[in-house]
């Protein structure tokens, strides 16, 4: 397991731990879950239901389920190999071998065009001596490519979610206009029909199952 040899290394580790919330949000499946659920709430037209705590809580739970194999594999490595912060070689070995399952997860869910973009842009933006040293599976490439890929997929799913609800809004709006009820808000009338459609289609089950299965393979 990781050893903390002295106070200085402890301070360094604690400082790095402050980055964990950012990594947990942007470098895991959480980002796609959270964006899709937010788009669903907007499509339904209910800005406060479900509340943020419930929505993000569900995203966290599903992300823990999806990311669990990566965590288990990393834990197995730490149990089988001693990682000391005073030993640079052991730290480098951990980043090379211990994080291999995580890098594999990122690779499996990166769109090819995003990966190619960040590989090519590195050669243009970074100084040559640093760009030449950068490996193709470096986290400097995988993390931004993964995040952009996840956001792209989330918005694609959000677009498909929006379509049936927009149709309901248009139908209700036209009916109200035909009845001369221009002062009545179409959103107020269409909301029950949106909820009914979502419930009849077993929306939560289909959506969550589809999102989880998208990380298969």
Curated annotation (Swiss-Prot):
**What PROSITE patterns does this protein map onto?**
FLIP_1, FLIP_2
GO cellular component terms, alphabetically, are:
plasma membrane
Which compartments is it annotated to reside in? Cell membrane
What's the domain of life for this entry? Bacteria
Instruction: Spell out the InterPro entries in the cross-references.
Output: T3SS_IM_P, T3SS_YscR-like
Single GO BP term: bacterial-type flagellum-dependent swarming motility
Spell out where the chain crosses the membrane. Answer: 11-31, 53-73, 157-177, 181-201
A Pfam family the protein falls into: FliP
Asked if the keyword Lyase belongs to this entry, the reply reads no
Primary site of residence: membrane
UniProt membrane topology term: Multi-pass membrane protein
Alphabetically list the UniProt keywords. Cell membrane, Membrane, Plasmid, Transmembrane, Transmembrane helix, Virulence
Outline what the protein does.
Answer: Component of the yop secretion machinery. May have a role in the negative pathway regulation of yop expression controlled by calcium.
The family annotation for this protein states: Belongs to the FliP/MopC/SpaP family.
- Name the record gives this protein: Yop proteins translocation protein R
Q: Which organism is it from?
A: Yersinia pestis
């Amino acid at each position: 397991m990781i050893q903390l040899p002295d106070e200085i290394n402890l301070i360094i580790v604690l400082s790095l731990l402050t980055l964990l919330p950012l990594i947990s949000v942007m470098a895991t499946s959480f980002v796609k879950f959270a964006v899709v659920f937010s788009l669903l709430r907007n499509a339904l037209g209910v800005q406060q239901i479900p509340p943020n705590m419930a929505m993000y809580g569900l995203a966290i739970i599903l992300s823990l389920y999806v990311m669990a194999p990566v965590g288990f594999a990393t834990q197995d490595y730490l149990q089988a190999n001693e990682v000391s912060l005073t030993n640079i070689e052991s730290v480098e070995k951990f980043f090379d071998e211990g994080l291999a399952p995580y890098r594999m997860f990122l690779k499996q869910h990166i769109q090819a065009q995003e990966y190619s973009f960040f590989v090519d842009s590195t050669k243009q933006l970074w100084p040559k001596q640093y760009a030449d040293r950068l490996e193709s599976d470096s986290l400097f490439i995988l993390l931004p490519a993964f995040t952009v890929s996840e956001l792209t997929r989330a918005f694609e799913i959000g677009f498909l979610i929006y379509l049936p609800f927009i149709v309901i809004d248009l139908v209700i709006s036209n009916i109200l206009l035909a009845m001369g009820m221009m002062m009545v808000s179409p959103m107020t009338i269409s909301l029950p029909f949106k909820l009914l459609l979502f419930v009849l289609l077993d929306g939560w089950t289909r959506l969550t199952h589809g999102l989880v299965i998208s990380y298969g393979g």
